[in-house]
Amino acid sequence: MSESPYKSGTTHFGFRDVAAKDKQKLVGQVFTSVARNYDLMNDLMSMGVHRAWKRYYVATAQVKPGDRVLDLAGGTGDIAALLKERVGVEGSVVLGDINAGMLSVGRDRLTNRGLVLGLDYVQCNAEALPFPDNSFDLVTIAFGLRNVTDKDAGLREMYRVLKVGGQARVLEFSEVTADWFKPIYDFHSFKILPKLGKLFANDSDSYQYLAESIRKHPPQEELKAMMGQAGFERCHYKNLTGGIVSIHSGYKL
């Protein structure tokens, strides 16, 4: 297990080294800036494919009617909405996010869609979740783990709040596996994406950070090992779209 960033004193914020205690605030500023344009941001970052990734991510989760699910870094609520369809009226979904602006957007959007019952919204830090042990049948985090300062702590908390037999699933931008595609992907990420952010959201800096944060995120095998170190068993991952994203899964047994 790697040393906590809080003990070493520094961590990365994109390609910059910053004090570990400052990263949460810096990431918060990014997501406060992009909250109202979050879906646009995902469209630009994924070239529009993120919607299909998310549908597959939820469709392949072992979630059933009556389950209680925690969706961390739930953002604008698109994953929570898909999960609520699957748990039905007997089940419940808690949408957790550290950023109040993102949480507000998610609540408004789901309420406007008529999704009210069985949905709760909690502002929380993934590194110190305000839930008892063994609370959820499924814990998800989509495009959020790379922004957590202490990822090991976040994974341990996901494990703690899962019920025995429960599953954790991580959907995240990952390491591209096709060598021929890497230069194309890098060009899009570092040359095109910030310009699109400036053009459509008047915010190139946030999009530059988000591209850099993907490159600093642990690659597939490393994240799989981290999940095992956090206590998860039967850990595995599946690459989507040539490794642009991957889905990692682990169980509390």
Curated annotation (Swiss-Prot):
Which GO biological process annotations does it have?
aerobic respiration; menaquinone biosynthetic process; methylation
- Binding of S-adenosyl-L-methionine: at which residues? T76, D97, N125, A126
Return the EC number.
2.1.1.163, 2.1.1.201
* GO MF entry, a single one: demethylmenaquinone methyltransferase activity
This protein's pathway: Quinol/quinone metabolism; menaquinone biosynthesis; menaquinol from 1,4-dihydroxy-2-naphthoate: step 2/2; Cofactor biosynthesis; ubiquinone biosynthesis
Catalysed reaction equations from the record: a 2-demethylmenaquinol + S-adenosyl-L-methionine = a menaquinol + S-adenosyl-L-homocysteine + H(+); a 2-methoxy-6-(all-trans-polyprenyl)benzene-1,4-diol + S-adenosyl-L-methionine = a 5-methoxy-2-methyl-3-(all-trans-polyprenyl)benzene-1,4-diol + S-adenosyl-L-homocysteine + H(+)
Give the EC class as a word.
transferase
Which Pfam families does the entry link to? Ubie_methyltran (PF01209)
Give the family this protein belongs to, as stated in its UniProt record: Belongs to the class I-like SAM-binding methyltransferase superfamily. MenG/UbiE family.
Function description? Methyltransferase required for the conversion of demethylmenaquinol (DMKH2) to menaquinol (MKH2) and the conversion of 2-polyprenyl-6-methoxy-1,4-benzoquinol (DDMQH2) to 2-polyprenyl-3-methyl-6-methoxy-1,4-benzoquinol (DMQH2).
Q: Per its UniProt record, what HAMAP family does this chain match?
A: MenG_UbiE_methyltr
Provide the protein name.
Ubiquinone/menaquinone biosynthesis C-methyltransferase UbiE
